[in-house]
Amino acid sequence: MIQKNSRLVVADNSGAKEVLVIGILGGTRRRYANIGDVVVVAVKSGSGGTVKKHDVLKGVIVRSKSGIRHENGSYIKFYDNALVLLKEDLSIIGTRIFGPVVRELGKKFSKIVSLAQLVL
């Protein structure tokens, strides 16, 4: 579960390395976000690219330490919390996705699943 003030790793090549969650979209009193949810983030560190430090963007969570339950009953947990940065129209900024993602993302964000190195 990701909440406000959580720091996440960026899993694409947009130029940002680490972000801070400043809002969770989808309700007025929403406290937690899971895999597939859209959050508002502030860039905390980066390597210079499309995205600069202190930019405020949207992102979709692709990996979480708390994990996700598949339809067949199995659970998948990851070693880090990661997200992919999005533009205002919810299209991805980067052109590559690093690390594994879950196949449940394909329902809303099929582009992320098609660019991912490994789909679980």
Swiss-Prot record:
Instruction: Please indicate which superkingdom the organism of origin belongs to.
Output: Bacteria
GO BP, sorted A to Z: translation
Note the PROSITE patterns from the entry: RIBOSOMAL_L14
Q: Which residues form a coiled coil?
A: none
For this protein, the record's Gene3D superfamilies field holds:
Ribosomal protein L14 (2.40.150.20)
An example Gene Ontology molecular-function term: structural constituent of ribosome
Q: Which GO terms describe its cellular component?
A: cytosolic large ribosomal subunit
Q: Sorted alphabetically, which CDD domains does this protein's record hold?
A: Ribosomal_uL14
A Pfam family cross-referenced in the UniProt record is: Ribosomal_L14
Keywords attached to this Swiss-Prot or TrEMBL record, sorted alphabetically, are: Ribonucleoprotein, Ribosomal protein, RNA-binding, rRNA-binding
Question: Matching InterPro entries, A to Z?
Answer: Ribosomal_uL14, Ribosomal_uL14_bac-type, Ribosomal_uL14_CS, Ribosomal_uL14_sf
- Quaternary structure annotation from Swiss-Prot or TrEMBL: Part of the 50S ribosomal subunit. Forms a cluster with proteins L3 and L19. In the 70S ribosome, L14 and L19 interact and together make contacts with the 16S rRNA in bridges B5 and B8.
Describe the function of this protein.
Binds to 23S rRNA. Forms part of two intersubunit bridges in the 70S ribosome.
Entry similarity comment: Belongs to the universal ribosomal protein uL14 family.
Indicate what this protein is called per its UniProt record: Large ribosomal subunit protein uL14
Lineage runs:
Bacteria, Bacillati, Mycoplasmatota, Mollicutes, Acholeplasmatales
